[in-house]
A protein has these predicted regions:
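A solvent-exposed, acidic/Ser-Thr-rich amphipathic alpha-helical stretch
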Residues: 28-114
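Acidic/histidine-enriched, glycine/proline-rich intrinsically disordered or flexible terminal extensions
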Residues: 154-177
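Short, low-complexity N-terminal intrinsically disordered segments enriched in polar/charged residues
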Residues: 1-29, 33-37, 49
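Short beta-strand edge/turn micro-motifs at domain boundaries
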Residues: 111-113, 127-160
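A structural preference for long, well-packed, hydrophobic secondary-structure segments
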Residues: 9-10, 18-22, 112-117, 127-128
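Hydrophobic/aromatic beta-strand elements that line small-molecule binding cavities or substrate pockets
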Residues: 97-102, 118, 129-135
Length: 177
């Protein structure tokens, strides 16, 4: 293994960690900076191209469960996590990635596969896989394409909509990378 490959691998690990840490802290601006300017994020909810679209999507995820306005007559049933968000607070959330496999294909292209767990103050919420592609941009390896695949989520939890808006207890998907 060449030194540049080791540097690429560590930069990619750092990129994945920054995505999680910034997202967990509600720093969406910094979270989105781990994507290339024309980066792509795919989830069960859709495909988002470019930092602006990814930012809008991430902001909508953070807003999930908030009532339209304080004077809304529409009754909104929220989970405890969504109630925290409705009060303008970032709840306790933590992303954990594990079993990350990185394939550095060239000096300009790499792929990674990771399992993730998403925890809230109530415990395990949902879990799945990230399938990522990376490229160096201005000397930093950034995500050019992230495909988030939710394998399972608990009904009523934050991630219940992560599989395209469905409230699910378990999703059946192939476990291969």
């Amino acid at each position: 293994m060449e030194v540049w490959e080791l540097v690429a691998r560590e930069s990619i690990r750092d990129c994945i960690a920054r995505y999680n840490a910034n997202g967990d802290s509600g720093r969406i601006d910094q979270m989105v900076e781990v994507f290339a300017p024309d980066g792509i994020m795919e989830t069960g909810s859709g495909r988002y191209v470019g930092r602006e679209a990814i930012h809008a999507f991430m902001s909508s995820v953070a807003d999930r469960g908030r009532p339209a306005s304080d004077d809304s007559e529409e009754s909104v049933i929220m989970t405890p996590t969504q109630e925290w968000l409705a009060r303008g607070r970032v709840p306790f959330i933590r992303h954990f990635t594990a079993t990350t496999q990185i394939d550095v294909l060239s000096e300009t292209h790499a792929k990674a596969r990771s399992y993730y767990l998403f925890l809230t103050v109530h415990g395990l919420d949902h879990w799945g896989r990230y399938l990522d592609e990376f490229a160096p941009v201005d000397g930093k390896w950034l995500i050019t394409h992230r495909r988030e695949m939710t394998d399972a989520a608990f009904t009523g939890g934050w991630g219940a909509g992560a599989a395209g808006g469905e409230a699910v207890e378990h999703l059946t998907r192939p476990l291969s990378f």
